[in-house]
Amino acid sequence: MIKLFASDMDGTLLNPNHVISDTTAQAIRDLQAQSDIEFLIATGRDYRSAKWLLDQHQLTARIIAVNGAATYDVKGNLEDVFALDLADTQTLIERFATPGTQTLVSLKSLNGYYVNDLSLYRRRMEAFLNRAKEAASDDSL
């Protein structure tokens, strides 16, 4: 017997427009109506982003966020955190941010993101998006 239905969001629960469709929302409600099956979200997104998407359809679920670093109950209470401590985080930043190179350090926390070089981040994101646009418009693919 199924006791739990867990779903990722991006590329799974969300449609190509990156939202939960009305049909999917109704399927979740139907699943949740079966009191013996728990529905939860497991995502790389932070809690607020995942919760906002659920709120668009008045859905509730436990959420495993930030690639498993935090778990939240249905009411949004933080249950567990599995995070690097500050000293380990600083060590990682120092190791990867090599002087004289264009090393980009990007860290996700429960409350947002840290980027060591915002200008470099923007340039790399623009280059990535331009490559994606070119690939999307390439008729030979």
Could you describe each region identified by the protein language model?
Residues 52-60, 118-122:
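Glycine-rich loop at the start of a catalytic domain that most often binds anionic cofactors/ligands
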Residues 3-18:
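Asp-based phosphoryl-transfer active-site loop
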Residues 17-33:
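Basic, amphipathic juxtamembrane/active-site segments
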Residues 2, 36, 60, 100-102:
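A general structural motif
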Residues 69-141:
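HAD-like small-molecule phosphatases
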